């Protein structure tokens, strides 16, 4: 089969597929026109060719670009678009719960003045993070977590960010993609230990927002994991060909340890040949 369009980040289903694995879809676009989703778990084990002809389109305006900013945007879009507001990366900066917008009032009301989780996930190591309650479990799929647990629920983003900042004193908020792309063994006892340590570290100030939930576990469609990761970009390698060994997080895992971050290439127009 053949697929052609502008890449967007991989999307997943809330429920695992019949094999108990995270179910992935490629939801690209024809410049700005959304394309039908293509289920891609079945691509694992197949020969894949990805051809990049040099065209990149801004995912906001459709403008032809030489380089992208903030996941497929032009510099102007990245500077002005609501989805690139600073409180996306630094939740503690949001002020929309006070009625103050940093960039776009309606967008921030819809996305940031909403209930949020603070969570711990196991990617390559254990990390703390923040996400809207409606983004569960997709956020965990995106980062390639093998397990995760929500430990607090707040009424708005800034407060979740405040909790996260406090927990960054004992936990990282970053994912090491090379460690994540290894065959990470689920460690629920360690996750539960971190949960209790976080509660203890936060203390009574944030206790009203604590929640006691069971961890969730995720399996990914991977035949074999790379022993040594070699990250590919279409700017440097415009033609990628090989056996697709798996999908984890936002990465396609090819043979010979080569990996490609699909989200990183949002806006890139490609042709994909499968089989």
Feature map (PLM): residue ranges:
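Non-catalytic accessory segments flanking enzymatic or RNA/DNA-binding domains
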Residues: 1-275
């Amino acid at each position: 089969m053949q697929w052609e369009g502008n890449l967007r980040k991989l999307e997943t289903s809330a429920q695992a597929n019949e094999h108990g694995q995270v179910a992935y879809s490629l939801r690209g676009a024809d410049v700005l026109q959304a394309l039908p989703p293509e289920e891609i778990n079945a691509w694992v084990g197949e020969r894949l060719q990805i051809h990049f002809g040099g065209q990149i389109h801004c995912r906001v305006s459709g403008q032809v670009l030489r380089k992208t900013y903030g996941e497929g945007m032009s510099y102007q879009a990245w500077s002005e678009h609501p989805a690139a507001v600073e409180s996306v990366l630094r939740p503690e900066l949001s002020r929309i719960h006070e009625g103050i917008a940093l960039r776009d009032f309606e967008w921030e009301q819809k996305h940031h003045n909403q209930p949020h989780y603070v969570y711990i996930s196991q990617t390559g190591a254990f990390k703390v993070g923040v996400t809207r309650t409606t983004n569960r479990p997709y956020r965990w799929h995106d980062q390639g977590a093998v397990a995760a647990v929500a430990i607090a629920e707040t009424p708005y983003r800034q407060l979740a960010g405040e909790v996260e900042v406090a927990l960054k004193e004992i936990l990282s908020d970053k994912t090491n993609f090379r460690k994540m792309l290894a065959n990470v063994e689920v460690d629920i006892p360690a996750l539960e230990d971190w949960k209790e340590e976080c509660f203890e570290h936060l203390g009574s100030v944030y206790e009203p927002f604590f929640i006691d939930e069971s961890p969730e576990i995720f399996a990914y469609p991977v035949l074999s994991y790379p022993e040594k990761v070699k990250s590919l970009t279409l700017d440097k390698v415009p033609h990628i060909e090989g056996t697709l060994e798996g999908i984890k997080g936002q990465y396609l895992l090819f043979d010979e340890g080569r990996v490609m971050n699909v989200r990183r290439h949002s806006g890139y127009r490609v042709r994909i040949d499968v089989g």
